[in-house]
Amino acid sequence: MLLKKSKLIGNQTIEISGSKSISNRLLILHQLFNNIEIKNLSNSQDTQLLEKALNSNSETIDIHHAGTAMRFLTSYFSIQEGKTVVLTGSERMKQRTIKFLVDALRALGAKISYLEKEGYPPLKITGKKLEKNTVTISANISSQFISSLMLIGAKLENGLEIILEGKVTSKPYLEMTLKILRTVGIANHWEGNTIKIEPIDSNNHVEKHLQNIPFIVESDWSSASYFYSLAAISRETVNLKSFKPYSLQGDSALREIYWDFFGVNTISEGAEAKISLLPEHYFNFPEKIVLNMNDCPDI
């Protein structure tokens, strides 16, 4: 294989698909409240599979390799009263544990059974009203298990209190979920090791608040990392559309990373939600880089 350095045409503008993490959370909320208009939805396969599953009337839902869809749909279908589904996936998906989430949902009163190996998909889920509103779950597991519970919390009669045990991993993803819930009008609090999602009641007209309000999904920062690398290597300016200066995504940390270690400055143009990646032409690159990527593993 022969690799040659290419000449990048500078100052081009590129539009990246919406954030998968934000899109998947909004799809669940849209299905729960029926009146969220989502723009710039992610075109990722995971998001497409989740959207297809939410709109399906089939008794068997196959989400293939989409791990986020498996986790979010497990909680979603557990509160769909009177509906029974089998939630399955690829052979690889059947090797990925979902026990922590199922245990938490069962503790709330959900009716979920394993159809093959204990602790793993496929699942048989019979939707019902969940009577309990407090659950304890390990904090050092995938944040998607916890976010999955948070997304349905406001639909429970008394809301949901989640007690986290241990050190939290991927904290930015939990904060993202909480911020999205607040944006749609669902009150929540995170104090110490306890997350509280307030219920929807007669004084909290979330559906009315959301009516005809469009959500423009900011573009995906982890995907932007490739273009930051192009700017860093070529030392040419690259422009990216639909990125907000105050991002919900933990992966937006790449702005500081590429400035500190590669001399690529990020300039925001708020009116157009556009950012320009401007490389410093006389930058002294460090001999080595040491970074803690715990809060932004996708980059």
How should each PLM-predicted stretch be described?
Residues 1-299:
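Short, structured segments at the rim of ligand-binding sites
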